[in-house]
Amino acid sequence: MFFGRRGHVIISKGIYYLKGNLVLKSDVNLHLEKDAYLLFSGKADDFLPEVWTRWEGTELYGHSPMIYAKHATNIAITGQGTIDAQGGREFASWSQIEVSDRNRLRKMGEKLIPVTERIFGKGTILRPSCIQFMGCSRILVEGITIKNSPFWTIHPVYCDNVIVRSITIDSHYPNNDGCDPESTSNVLIEE
């Protein structure tokens, strides 16, 4: 069930290399047909400039997730294709060395440093989620396969009316949780 009116972005069969993030706007369904393969670069600098995000419960401006939406309504990612974030290329090694940046971010949150001053971009080490929705509503993720996330796989934050249905996640790096709703209401996750 997709609620959009604007239209579909259809990714047909084939391998598509992406250098940088893909930003979803309102009323759009990103539809991956069978045997469509989105292959992200897996290189940290390709996911700059920083975007408003949340990392383990603390807001910041950091590396963009591979697929990102902010304040969008009626958005979907559907189909039978595959999204490969290539999280192991560069990001996997970060889990061992991100402790100081993680601690610095948490201290900034505890001290109530304004989010706009919590900048963790180039030269910092906090892995991004693969797919993140920030402050969005009426979201559908259905049927796709997601591989090799650098961190949490699907991460809705401050969202409402989220459906995640019949997806496959194949990711074996540290913290590759499947779906991590944070401060989000009306969420349905089902096979």
Model regions and ranges:
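Extracellular/periplasmic carbohydrate-active domains that bind, remodel
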Residues: 1-191
